């Protein structure tokens, strides 16, 4: 590995982390040598760089050194292709067959492309085989599976390119598909789109084009239950079921990422890929993209197409009153996270808080929210008639009950880097203080205090505008572009005729009743002209700039005639005589996505130890119950029947079910043929029938004695009520964890994941700068952690100084801190009572955890990242440096990851516990990255901008809707610092925030009870927000959520299975006896009438209340009839003679 390019302080930081890691591994190795773990040493290999990760993940020796050499002179993608060729041709690694070499080459190449982090190279490619063309030549078949999705479209597509690249090097022919195979691909992908989901759906002709011309056969394992109907039982396709991996690679890979594949094909001068030009040309840019190229930003409604009940719409696409775009980066935004004022969070009924995901109109698809109180909050009309802007969260809490209408929901802070990452044209910037300041500095040398510049009086703003030709200050620039000429003239006429302006107090008075009757009150609200209502009079303070913009003088007399223009911004500039610029030219629509998360990770159902107890533990899988279980009255107490792997000790020959024998020797599987029942030694197949041998069998286990001995081994009393095990093990050898670990976990109330580690999940939020006082520690503690100065170079002495966060430091929620404290106490108990070594953490409070090492790990990946805990936050999120998130191949658009204590991870993790199924190695720390190199993290992090203020050229360029790539040269980006010490340090930000955790602690989506309550809250908020069309929201929720649910549940009711409430066995139809044939328990329905009806009444009520379309109303009525016909008893009532005589029969 090349030397890390960093300052002396950063080198000391990395060295300290690695020294502590090394010490922890020594302690863990000593402990594991004494215990009953699968191996006596730590099973997570360390990796300092990408090359190490790839070698450890794929297991091809010598590949790391080659990658380091290639990386010096090639791009990442070129390096991946070249290392693939070298592996395939035998320059690296030793392989028995040509097929094995090709398979290893493709896996290694994909691992390089995905930074050696995701599991796709080992889980997403099941196998590679050589097939036969009809002319007798060979071709490559790559069998993809579901986990290939985690690689991303580009890596999926490039894996196919790698296959072509390496086949040429070793003389394998191209794939020549038969016509029926081409049509099978078309049918299969269309069907997959219906039963699963695709980000991009190519046309049938595009699918045919790809299959006919792709030189590698894109094959796959069956992943869905659905089968094709037309092109079945094909000779060279081994299944009639849908191959999900194939569909993903062809549609989201080659079809969607064709331009990127073409770029690499051109670089490498590869022939046979000319058909990509047809594919790229066929995917015409239309609609939105064409309009944006013509300097028009067209509204996009994609983000509200699939609305979910209970998750509100905050703004319809680009609608006035919605989020106003503001460019910039706070210390807790960027990398797909955006900032809003915490007052906005409060006044949107607490649906948004830190970490809440919003589905947004642009620049990307989604963004996690962060609190930034230096930008503008919402403007609201109170029941009193006042129009006020609320920037302070305390005021928001005080006034929230008085809000009648949210006229404008405030600003949303999005950084330039997110537009660059998404390659989205820059939207026109509003005229904000940052831009105005450039104009002021260029025109005026007069020194004015900073506070006055930010919040000037009307006199100062007008003086600067008139004397120095500086555009009118944003404070007094209203949203003139939101009204039309008719409204402008009506407002002007009304102010002339009915207004009363006092020069002394600068208040414009307007009669309230007349304002309402003439629509002037509404026009003032559209303009965001703040005002109070007192004694039936509207009072507008500091009104002179407003009056002048109407073309009036201080006596409310017209100074100039109305210009001949429909652009009201230009009109105000003409009438006033000074420059006026647009205040909010760009709006961004948004709705709620996922709520924020900060919670412990549990398996479903939860477990505290990977020890099987079958049905003996009941529905709760309780080991305590299993220890007292008896099959019958006369049965042996604690004897249970479970499926386990039989093992034997090579030293003493004893048969056991554990990794280690009582004599101290490590055991090995005792293999036998499942058909012949004969023992198999030193062979991979049965010598009699050729079947693969196994060690797994149903055994009768004296669990009570194992249970009692485990308590004795750790010195605990049998006073526990609940210790949660598992019904059945999922690992290949079916060998359990030591039971002692489960006892200690239950004592400390912690739960494990599939690999034996204790984890805590949190939504990802970026953080580049932090203050001691907002993360629950002191400046002194920060100094202990190696922070010596603030961002301005001053010595770190006060708790409120801002420091630049080090790349592997994390801040977790207080709740997470409490869970990590329990985990630390469990680990110490484990070290002392089970392993017999000294405790490691000695933690009594969460403050004792500050400075401990953690492992960060993202779902669908296989590489953990070493981190250090430096503090806690009230917010339900995990704050970390963008590079830390990027090193896990995550961004901050609403993703969530987990952390685990380092000692817990290295002590308890084992590959032997991972499920033996496709995807089993995902979400497991198969390798640990010890040092983050910015060059090797996900490239999205390279687009983060770092200046303290954006240049003036940037604001001007946005008015021309330029492509963000045109401005890379003038912006201070991470990419421009790579390879220098500045890649880690001296980052800045444009907008500060007083508290990163400001705002509600939890989204009301999580705190509200039933779905009906959430839906009512969603519609109540929609009625309150000016930028939202409530009837449209109601219709969309019915069509995309409630009606599909009602239909699905109705269908499920008719197809349901039966379930035993005692043992959980399921049956396609009820047993004739009505009792479970396995255990005698009651058999019940799995889908009940209540589940089918649950959304029916609310759907009917909402349909009427909001006047949804007649089509939707009729769908609801038809469903109502279907449900009634299924559940209501329409049998004819038996009538007696008396009923006829009394006439009641009529």
Swiss-Prot record:
Single Gene Ontology BP annotation: DNA catabolic process
Catalytic activity: DNA(n) + a 2'-deoxyribonucleoside 5'-triphosphate = DNA(n+1) + diphosphate; Exonucleolytic cleavage in the 3'- to 5'-direction to yield nucleoside 5'-phosphates
Subunit organization: Heterodimer of a large subunit and a small subunit.
GO molecular function per UniProt: DNA binding; DNA-directed DNA polymerase activity; single-stranded DNA 3'-5' DNA exonuclease activity
Protein name according to UniProt: DNA polymerase II large subunit
Record's function text: Possesses two activities: a DNA synthesis (polymerase) and an exonucleolytic activity that degrades single-stranded DNA in the 3'- to 5'-direction. Has a template-primer preference which is characteristic of a replicative DNA polymerase.
Keyword vocabulary terms for this entry: DNA replication, DNA-binding, DNA-directed DNA polymerase, Exonuclease, Hydrolase, Multifunctional enzyme, Nuclease, Nucleotidyltransferase, Transferase
EC number: 2.7.7.7, 3.1.11.1
Family: Belongs to the archaeal DNA polymerase II family.
Protein's UniProt keywords contain RNA-binding: no
Domain of life where this protein originates: Archaea
Keyword DNA damage: no
Pfam families assigned to the protein according to its UniProt record, in alphabetical order: PolC_DP2_cat, PolC_DP2_central, PolC_DP2_N
């Amino acid at each position: 590995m090349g030397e890390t390019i960093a300052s002396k302080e950063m080198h000391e930081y990395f060295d300290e982390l690695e020294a502590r890691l090394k010490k922890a591994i020594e302690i863990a190795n000593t402990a594991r040598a004494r215990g009953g773990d699968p191996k006596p040493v730590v099973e997570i290999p360390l990796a300092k760089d990408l090359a190490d990760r790839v070698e450890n993940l794929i297991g091809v020796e010598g590949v790391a050194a080659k990658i380091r050499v290639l990386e010096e002179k090639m791009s990442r993608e070129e390096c991946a292709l070249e290392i693939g060729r070298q592996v395939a041709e035998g320059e690296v690694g030793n392989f028995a067959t040509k097929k094995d070499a090709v398979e290893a080459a493709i896996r290694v190449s994909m691992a390089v492309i995905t930074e050696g982090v995701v599991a796709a190279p080992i889980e997403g490619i099941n196998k590679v085989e050589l097939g036969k063309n009809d002319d007798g030549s060979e071709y490559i078949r790559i069998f993809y599976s579901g986990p290939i999705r985690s690689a991303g479209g580009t890596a999926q597509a490039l894996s196919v390119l790698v296959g072509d690249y390496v086949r040429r090097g070793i003389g394998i022919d191209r794939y020549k598909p038969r016509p029926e195979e081409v049509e099978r691909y078309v049918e299969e992908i269309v069907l997959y789109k219906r039963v699963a989901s695709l980000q991009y759906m190519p046309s049938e002709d595009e699918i045919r084009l790809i299959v006919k011309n792709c030189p590698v056969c894109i094959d796959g394992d069956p992943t869905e239950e659905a089968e094709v109907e037309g092109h079945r039982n094909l000779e060279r396709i081994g299944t009639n079921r849908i191959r999900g991996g194939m569909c993903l690679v062809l549609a989201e890979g080659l079809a969607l990422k064709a331009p990127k594949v073409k770029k690499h094909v051109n670089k490498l001068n590869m022939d046979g890929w000319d058909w990509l030009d047809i594919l790229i040309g066929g995917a015409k840019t239309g609609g939105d993209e064409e309009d944006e190229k013509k300097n028009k930003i067209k509204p996009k409604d994609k983000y509200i197409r699939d609305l979910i009940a209970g998750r509100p719409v905050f703004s319809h696409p680009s609608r006035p009153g919605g989020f106003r775009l503001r460019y910039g980066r706070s210390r807790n935004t960027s990398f797909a996270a955006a900032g809003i004022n915490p007052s906005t969070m409060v006044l949107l009924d607490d649906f948004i808080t830190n970490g809440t995901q919003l589905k947004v109109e642009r620049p990307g698809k989604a963004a996690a929210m962060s609190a930034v109180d230096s930008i503008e909050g919402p403007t609201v009309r109170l029941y009193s008639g006042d129009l006020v802007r609320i920037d302070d969260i305390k005021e928001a809490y005080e006034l929230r009950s008085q809000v009648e209408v949210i006229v404008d929901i405030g600003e949303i802070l999005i950084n330039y880097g997110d537009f660059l990452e998404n390659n989205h044209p820059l939207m026109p910037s509003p005229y904000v203080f940052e831009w105005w300041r450039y104009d002021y500095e260029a025109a005026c040398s007069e020194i004015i205090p900073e506070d006055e510049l930010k919040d000037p009086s009307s006199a100062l703003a007008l003086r600067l505008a008139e004397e120095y030709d500086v555009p009118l200050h944003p404070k007094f620039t209203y949203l003139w572009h939101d009204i039309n000429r008719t409204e402008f003239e009506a407002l002007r006429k009304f102010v002339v005729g009915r207004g009363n302006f006092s020069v002394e107090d600068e208040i414009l008075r307007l009669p309230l009743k007349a304002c309402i009757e003439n629509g002037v009150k509404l026009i003032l609200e559209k303009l965001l002209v703040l005002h109070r209502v007192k004694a039936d009079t509207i009072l507008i303070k500091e009104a002179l700039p407003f009056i002048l913009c109407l073309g009036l003088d201080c006596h409310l007399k017209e100074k100039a005639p109305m210009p001949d223009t429909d652009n009201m911004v230009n009109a105000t500039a003409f009438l006033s005589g000074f420059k006026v610029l647009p205040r909010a030219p760009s709006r961004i629509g948004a709705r709620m996505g996922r709520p924020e998360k900060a919670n412990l990770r549990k398996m479903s159902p939860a477990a505290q130890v990977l020890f099987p107890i079958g049905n003996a533990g009941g529905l709760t899988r309780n080991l305590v119950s299993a220890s007292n279980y008896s099959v019958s009255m006369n049965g042996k107490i604690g004897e249970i029947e479970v499926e386990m792997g039989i093992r034997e000790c090579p030293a003493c020959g004893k048969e056991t079910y554990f990794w280690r024998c009582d004599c101290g020797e490590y055991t090995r599987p005792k293999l036998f043929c499942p058909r012949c029942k004969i023992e198999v030694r030193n062979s991979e197949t049965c010598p009699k029938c050729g079947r693969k041998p196994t060690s797994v069998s149903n055994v009768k286990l004296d669990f009570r004695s194992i249970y009692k001995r485990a308590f004795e081994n750790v010195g605990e009393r049998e006073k526990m009520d609940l210790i949660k095990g598992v019904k059945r093990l999922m690992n290949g050898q079916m060998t359990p964890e030591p039971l002692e670990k489960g006892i200690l976990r239950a004592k400390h109330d912690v739960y494990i994941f599939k690999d034996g580690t204790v984890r805590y999940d949190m939504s990802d939020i970026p953080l580049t700068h932090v203050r001691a006082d907002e993360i629950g520690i002191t400046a002194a503690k920060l100094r202990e952690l190696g922070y010596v100065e603030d961002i301005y170079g001053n010595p770190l002495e006060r708790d409120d100084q801002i420091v630049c966060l080090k790349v592997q430091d994390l801040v977790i929620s207080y709740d997470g801190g409490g869970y990590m404290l329990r985990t630390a106490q469990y680990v110490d108990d484990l070290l002392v009572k089970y392993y017999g070594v000294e405790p490691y953490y000695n933690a009594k409070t969460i403050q004792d955890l500050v400075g401990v090492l953690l492992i960060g790990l993202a779902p669908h990946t296989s590489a953990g990242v070493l981190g250090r805990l430096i503090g806690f936050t009230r917010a339900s999120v995990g704050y970390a440096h963008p590079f830390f998130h990027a090193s896990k191949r995550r961004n901050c658009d609403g993703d969530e990851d987990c952390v685990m204590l380092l000692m817990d991870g290295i002590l308890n993790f084992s590959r032997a516990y991972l499920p033996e199924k496709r995807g089993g190695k995902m979400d497991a720390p198969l390798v640990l990255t010890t040092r983050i190199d910015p060059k090797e993290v996900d490239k999205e992090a390279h687009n983060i901008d770092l200046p303290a203020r954006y240049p003036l050229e940037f604001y001007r360029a946005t008015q021309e809707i330029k492509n963000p790539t045109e401005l890379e040269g003038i912006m201070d980006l991470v990419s421009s610092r790579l390879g220098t010490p500045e890649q880690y340090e001296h980052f800045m930000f444009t907008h500060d925030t007083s508290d990163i955790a400001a705002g509600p602690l939890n989204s009301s989506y999580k705190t509200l009870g039933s779905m009906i309550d959430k839906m009512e809250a969603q519609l109540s908020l929609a009625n309150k927000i000016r930028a939202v069309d409530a009837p449209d929201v109601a219709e969309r929720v019915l069509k995309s959520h409630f009606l599909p649910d009602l239909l699905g549940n109705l269908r499920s009711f008719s197809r349901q299975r039966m379930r035993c409430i005692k043992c959980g066995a399921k049956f396609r139809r009820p047993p004739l006896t009505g009792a479970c044939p396995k255990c005698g328990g009651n058999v019940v329905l799995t889908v009940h009438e209540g589940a089918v009806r649950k959304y029916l009444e609310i759907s009917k009520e909402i349909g009427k209340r909001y006047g949804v379309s007649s089509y939707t109303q009729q769908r609801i009525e038809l469903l109502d009839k279907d449900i009634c016909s299924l559940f209501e008893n329409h049998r004819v009532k038996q009538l007696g003679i008396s009923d006829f005589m009394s006439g009641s029969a009529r």
